Amino acid sequence: MLESSVVGIGKWVVEDYIFVGLFFVVACFISCVMLALPVFIAPSSHERHKGDSYECGFDKLSSTGERFNVRFYLVGILFIIFDLEIIFLFPWAVSARELGPAAFVSVLIFLIILTVGFVYEFVSGALDWR
């Protein structure tokens, strides 16, 4: 009796994942087709300026591989961090009443940690452009 139930459970699990596997195979096939399609359809151009950046119809002013200040990357990372904070807060705000006080405390701890990080960045001068 035990062996037949184990086999039945194993068969049931495999049947559940057949659709996931089929979805994965179809997604991989469509992705490969989409990646290969431009190779066959797009016209090929062998001009000298093909890889250059386009600056509103004007000639290039400098090389494309120009160096950026590290502060641009720092501000970008900070933007992503605080943008993700807002993304995490929206679902919580929608269902705050149903979640109860434990969820409120966890979100409060989350906000305190992010605020401490922001104060540290501000005090250390990471946001100054001097």
UniProtKB/Swiss-Prot annotation:
GO cellular component: NADH dehydrogenase complex; plasma membrane
Transmembrane regions: 17-37, 74-94, 99-119
Pfam families: Oxidored_q4
Signal peptide segment: none
GO molecular-function term, one example from the UniProt record: NADH dehydrogenase (ubiquinone) activity
Assigned EC number: 7.1.1.-
Keywords tagged on the record: Cell inner membrane, Cell membrane, Membrane, NAD, Quinone, Translocase, Transmembrane, Transmembrane helix, Transport, Ubiquinone
Subunit structure: NDH-1 is composed of 14 different subunits. Subunits NuoA, H, J, K, L, M, N constitute the membrane sector of the complex.
Family per similarity comment: Belongs to the complex I subunit 3 family.
Its biological purpose: NDH-1 shuttles electrons from NADH, via FMN and iron-sulfur (Fe-S) centers, to quinones in the respiratory chain. The immediate electron acceptor for the enzyme in this species is believed to be ubiquinone. Couples the redox reaction to proton translocation (for every two electrons transferred, four hydrogen ions are translocated across the cytoplasmic membrane), and thus conserves the redox energy in a proton gradient.
Official protein name in the record: NADH-quinone oxidoreductase subunit A
Annotated organism of origin: Neorickettsia sennetsu (strain ATCC VR-367 / Miyayama)
